[in-house]
UniProtKB/Swiss-Prot annotation:
GO terms for cellular component: cytoplasm. Belongs to the HisA/HisF family. The keyword Secreted does not apply. Pathway: Amino-acid biosynthesis; L-histidine biosynthesis; L-histidine from 5-phospho-alpha-D-ribose 1-diphosphate: step 4/9. NCBIfam families: 1-(5-phosphoribosyl)-5-[(5-phosphoribosylamino)methylideneamino]imidazole-4-carboxamide isomerase (TIGR00007). It comes from the Bacteria. It is found in: Cytoplasm. The gene is hisA. InterPro entries: Aldolase_TIM, His_biosynth, HisA_bact_arch, Isoase_HisA-like, Isoase_HisA-like_bact, RibuloseP-bd_barrel. This is 1-(5-phosphoribosyl)-5-[(5-phosphoribosylamino)methylideneamino] imidazole-4-carboxamide isomerase. It catalyses: 1-(5-phospho-beta-D-ribosyl)-5-[(5-phospho-beta-D-ribosylamino)methylideneamino]imidazole-4-carboxamide = 5-[(5-phospho-1-deoxy-D-ribulos-1-ylimino)methylamino]-1-(5-phospho-beta-D-ribosyl)imidazole-4-carboxamide. Transmembrane segments: none annotated. It comes from Rhodopirellula baltica (strain DSM 10527 / NCIMB 13988 / SH1). One of its GO terms (molecular function) is 1-(5-phosphoribosyl)-5-[(5-phosphoribosylamino)methylideneamino]imidazole-4-carboxamide isomerase activity.
Length: 253
């Protein structure tokens, strides 16, 4: 994650999102697979567009693998994005075993977001973090403060904040936490700033804000909160924000 030198302007990493389903770029509302918007046929076009607008990294999501469908449905698209841009790529969705971890790292993915398996088998996740230091990110997706799993199709009884605290006590090798408030995702209503503040207080693991980042004011507020990073999705696709301005406001230049 980014470091900030004394006296410098706050800097927040921006991760433009590309969600993939059947090899195409899409967006879901609140993780609902029946509320899908498809943005053309070729995700590489968006990857190049974000790069030309100032993106220094990309956040990719395999929606097919996330809910247990074919783990290979989007593999070709991921590889083409990496080859076309050369940008560091963070990827989530269906990362539930070491074979998948090794396969995606070999394709060129920089780091992987692990959600469901991290919650259900924290011993395994800690082991993988220690085996692949700095390569694994805990994906904590919350609905009403509880961790959701299986592509957001199931909600557990585990508090998102307690889960983050326990992870930090087990290993120093987690790269980051991507924290998503499902109620905010794709709704264009702003992030859950209160939840983000609670999560930041629960752990010193670098936090990536995800879900509902919609306006330039949202970006400014996240910077003021000293949020290390943010994922921006639908607002870019819908033209509500220009990535170049988002990057400028975040100081990610």
């Amino acid at each position: 994650m980014s470091s900030q030198t004394p006296g410098s302007e706050p800097r927040m990493e921006i991760w433009p999102a590309i969600d993939l389903r059947h090899g195409k770029p899409v967006r879901l509302r609140q993780g609902d697979y029946d509320q899908q918007t498809t943005f053309g046929d070729d995700p590489v076009e968006f990857a190049k567009r974000w790069q030309e607008s100032g993106a220094k990294r990309l956040h990719l999501v395999d929606l097919d693998a996330a809910r247990g469908d074919s783990p290979d449905a989007n593999r070709d698209a991921v590889q083409r994005i990496i080859e076309a841009t050369g940008l560091p790529c963070q990827m989530g969705g269906g990362v539930r075993d070491e074979i998948t971890i090794e396969s995606l790292l070999n394709v060129g993915v920089t780091r992987l977001v692990v959600g469901s398996r991290a919650l259900k088998d924290p011993d395994w996740f800690v082991e993988m973090c220690d085996k692949y230091p700095g390569k694994l990110v805990a994906g904590i997706d919350a609905r009403d403060g509880k961790v959701a799993t299986q592509g957001w199709l199931e909600t557990s009884d585990v508090s998102a904040f307690e889960f983050a605290t326990k992870l930090r006590s087990r290993t120093e090798n987690i790269a980051a936490i991507v924290y998503t408030d499902i109620a905010k995702d794709g709704m264009m209503q702003g992030p859950n700033f209160e939840g983000l503040a609670e999560m930041a207080a629960a752990s010193d693991i670098p936090l990536v804000a995800s879900g509902g980042v919609t306006t330039y004011d949202d970006i400014k507020q996240l910077v003021e909160m000293k949020m290390p990073a943010a994922i921006v999705g639908r607002s870019l696709y819908d033209g509500v924000m220009e990535l170049g301005e988002v990057v400028r406001l975040a100081g990610d230049v």
